[in-house]
Amino acid sequence: TIRMYEPLYLSNYCHNHCVYCGFNQENKIVRKVLTMEEVQAEAKAIADMGFTHILLVAGESPKHAGVEYYRQVIELIRPMFAQISIEVQPMSVEDYKVLVEAGAHYVCVYQETYNEESYPRFHPKGLKANYRFRLETPDRAAEAGFRKVGIGALLGLDNWRTDAFFTALHLDYLE
């Protein structure tokens, strides 16, 4: 089955210093978190285009967009979409449960690279610097009740064949 979705970027605030990312905390860019009114307007525009699946995307900054913010967003847009997916900062089981109860169906997390030795070179500071916490995110999401969990690697950071292989191993473990 092929499913079409539309991303809705909620915030570009991020506490991470990923060397490859435009949301890097050190980048001097205008930062924004959508208000509930802006979320409502954007979600309506997406739904009016015929999309029934939405992906909520944000930089990793619980201070600016945390679990309570995401809960409010999900509850606000739930009547407009058959499926609500999230691609935000990794969370605890308890926080993920809040989002499942609010109506989120799917969580996606990219490990970026499965090479634990090179991982710190790409993620020197911030929440994402914790390799193990990120690696175990799909386990926590599933434990919290997400019906769908997606994983991936950002091919090109390290040897793409190795990352593809370890993504497949990770998937096999999760199944």
Language-model regions: role of each:
Residues 2-4, 84:
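Generic structural signal for residues in well-ordered beta-strands
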Residues 5-38:
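Canonical Radical SAM [4Fe-4S] cluster-binding loop centered on the CxxxCxxC motif
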Residues 1, 172-175:
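Short, intrinsically disordered, charge-balanced linker/junction segments flanking boundaries
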Residues 27-173:
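Conserved Radical SAM active-site core
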